Regions:
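Conserved beta-strand positions in the central sheet of alpha/beta enzyme cores
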Residues: 19, 38-41, 58-59, 85, ...
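Catalytic alpha/beta core domains of metabolic enzymes, predominantly
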Residues: 54, 61-184
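Glycine-rich beta-to-alpha transition loops that act as phosphate-gripper elements at the mouths
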Residues: 18-26, 42-44, 119-125
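Extended hydrophobic secondary-structure segments
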Residues: 11-37
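Short, structured coil segments at secondary-structure junctions
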Residues: 14, 34-35, 52-54, 145-146
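Short, acidic/turn-prone active-site loops that include or flank metal/cofactor-
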Residues: 37, 42-47, 61-65
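Glycine-rich, proline-tolerant flexible connector loops at the mouths of alpha/beta enzymes
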Residues: 1-14
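Hydrophobic/aromatic ligand-binding patch that stacks against planar heteroaromatic rings
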Residues: 30, 49, 139-141
Length: 184
């Protein structure tokens, strides 16, 4: 994507906050130089680029079905002083959904003080169902496990209100957990 730097600059000029979702250093570097604040995603194959970016990165496993590479790469990022969030990658139903939730629990156990991100769009966009209850359940899981950032999208028609749904669900589950009440 040769014009990524230009596009990021245009968005930043209009006061948008920008992240870049690429594994390719030739896209990541110009996007960050133009003002992207967050890089999704780094793993063992491209982690060296994170050292000189000067921005936060999202660390993903080398293999989505496992947590391969996470421990080694957390050590590198911490040694380099690079801020990061860990995303064990949420899998769609039928492709390892339950196991992926287990990976989030394992990451929280291994890294109790680290920021974690969940790409909930992987479930809402890939499940042909009303997204509001799906978002509520995922935000409830995030609240209970201390996952403080989610990535959602509104591409497919059944998820076209996901951002608003997540904002409402976030408030509901936060209140429920903070006050020991049912989320209603």
């Amino acid at each position: 994507f040769e014009s990524i730097g230009e596009i990021v600059s245009l968005l930043r000029d209009k006061d948008f906050r920008v992240s870049v979702d690429s594994l390719n250093p030739r896209e990541i570097e110009p996007a960050v130089a133009a003002g992207a604040e967050l890089v999704l995603s780094v793993h063992s194959g491209n982690i060296d680029v994170a050292r000189s970016l000067g921005c936060e990165v999202v660390l993903i496993p080398d293999d989505n079905a496992t947590l391969a590479g996470i421990d080694e790469n957390v050590k590198k990022l911490e040694t380099w002083g690079v801020p990061y969030r860990i995303d064990p990658v949420l899998e769609p139903i039928g492709f390892g959904f339950a196991r992926s939730l287990g990976r989030y629990l394992e990451i929280r156990k291994r890294y109790p003080d680290s920021e974690i991100m969940m790409g909930i769009g992987n479930l809402t966009e890939l499940t042909d169902a009303d997204s509001a209850p799906v978002n509520l359940l995922l935000l409830g899981f995030c609240q209970e496990t201390g996952i403080r950032s989610v990535l959602t999208t509104e591409v497919i028609h059944w998820a076209s209100s996901s951002v608003r749904e997540c904002e409402l669900a976030r408030k509901l589950v936060h209140y429920a957990c903070a006050h020991g009440q049912l989320p209603k």
